Amino acid sequence: MAKHLFTSESVSEGHPDKIADQISDAVLDAILEQDPKARVACETYVKTGMVMVGGEVTTSAWVDIEEITRKTVRDIGYTHSDMGFDADSCAILNVIGKQSPDINQGVDRADPKEQGAGDQGLMFGYANNETDVLMPAPITYSHKLVKRQSEVRKDKTLPWLRPDAKSQVTFAYNSDGSIAGIDAVVLSTQHSEDVTQADLIEGVMETIIKPVLPAKWLSKDTKYFINPTGRFVIGGPVGDCGLTGRKIIVDTYGGMARHGGGAFSGKDPSKVDRSAAYAARYVAKNIVAAGLADRCEIQVSYAIGVAEPTSISIETFGTAKVGEELLIDLVRRHFDLRPYGLTEMLNLARPIYQATAAYGHFGRNEFPWEATDKVDALRADAGL
């Protein structure tokens, strides 16, 4: 059978952009803990020796931005100046302002159910049945690799690891869409000066790659690229500046589904960039889990200040067991995609977001949008 290749990448919690995402979501969580109705748009910039936290916030809560930032950086593992970035000595600038009243009047309503969308925009949700979490395999295993890197760094199994790392996995697919195997694996990890390249390659292969990637997909032809430049001592915010919202493909489906362009981290649930993308994943996952399609991509769109979505469309890539018009009817009947409705449906007005800010927002069953609790209702209504 003819094969085609598809590649996705992930980055670790110590990557500069992910540091920024985690700080933004840590601030969001701290505010939501005190004020579930807060309006938050928190952006973070990190560079050598400095973190700047900005954005727009309307809330009755008071939170200690400096302490939240230092704790987040400390938990990631930047705790010594020889890494070029130290949680306890970096400068922290707070330039947060208030949300525009022009936006606020379009969002808030006397009847909460009529809450308008916080902005216009389009969002996509996706699911397929090639992994047990109904996510594409390339992004799923890219996340698993860098998550494993973090685990063996923090438990000192590989004490020379440092926080910054990237992974990339290329899968080969058969012409029928099934997985043929893994064609290539890339893992680059920051490390201390005192480890040899040979020890690093052996440690990464035996302790990170082999325990994570299923042997059934590996072969003598699988290619491995471990720290292919030969040296990765300078990393984190010294190597590159980091910004909130710059890893939107890592955060979602690894490029296998389309993306509306809006980032997630630092945004409260009134921002449909985030909440509607979560709801769209919830819809797509339940459609696939119900056996109504093997692959499902849903698009929703909104107008600022308007509650009802301006459009809903579904693409099943020829895998649907029922008509796509029926699927859209099922979505409208079983899922409330108005901003207030989806926030209530998924219980989003609570501090659950910092955990999403590294290793992907989807395919992790601890999050409410990963539930498959609509399966029976969808199957019954579809006549299956």
From Swiss-Prot:
Q: Which UniProt keywords apply?
A: ATP-binding, Cytoplasm, Magnesium, Metal-binding, Nucleotide-binding, One-carbon metabolism, Potassium, Transferase
Binding of K(+) occurs at 43
Q: What is this protein called?
A: S-adenosylmethionine synthase
**Chemical reaction(s) catalysed:** L-methionine + ATP + H2O = S-adenosyl-L-methionine + phosphate + diphosphate
Q: What biological process terms from GO does the record include?
A: one-carbon metabolic process; S-adenosylmethionine biosynthetic process
Against NCBIfam families, the record matches this protein to: metK
Identify the species of origin: Shewanella pealeana (strain ATCC 700345 / ANG-SQ1)
Kindly list the positions annotated as binding L-methionine: 56, 99, 240, 271
